[in-house]
Amino acid sequence: VTAPPAQAARLRAISAGDAGVEILERPNRGRDIAPFLHALQSGALDRFDAVLKVHTKKSPHLLQGDLRRRVLFAALAGSPAATARALAWFGDPKVGLVGPGPYFRTAPVYWMDDRARVEALAARIDAPARLGFFEGSMFWVRPAALAPLRGLDLPLEAFEAEAGQLDGTLHHALERLIPLAVTRAGYETRAIGGRRLTAARLASAGPMA
């Protein structure tokens, strides 16, 4: 579990005595993405075949932001059956990323203000700058499939200070980069229902829509 200092103390008190809970204290910077990358780069996730990435961000700027978060969690791990259904895909060694198919976004409008930054980051991991990502940034992932992201070695200072940004930040770009990294590592992305998901082939320049 990653959390800012004030919340980390409370979480340690709640989880005291549970050896299965590890609290990683991180500043409130880079939203859920920067702490997740820290956990990845630190090696804390290496011992797992699959990791569930969820967060408590409510996206108050979206009319249905909290509802979306609840729907995503329910689909990924809202019941033992849902969890088993998602995890079953990791029995296939080719699968690296699993999430809710209806929230896998490939339409050009979802580039928003992040395209140039995604293109630059994709070039750094030698991946094509295509568009296809799980909106809401909640999914199951095989840590080994994120090896290209570890090579970015992004310091905390590379992430913008928290100012309620709605788009155009490093963490927004990385949200869109994750499936590209999975593909670059040689793995597939699947919807929970089994459909193979691929990023849209878009030109590297020109109109956004």
Language-model regions: role of each:
Residues 1-209:
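ER/Golgi luminal nucleotide-sugar-dependent glycosyltransferases, focusing on the catalytic module
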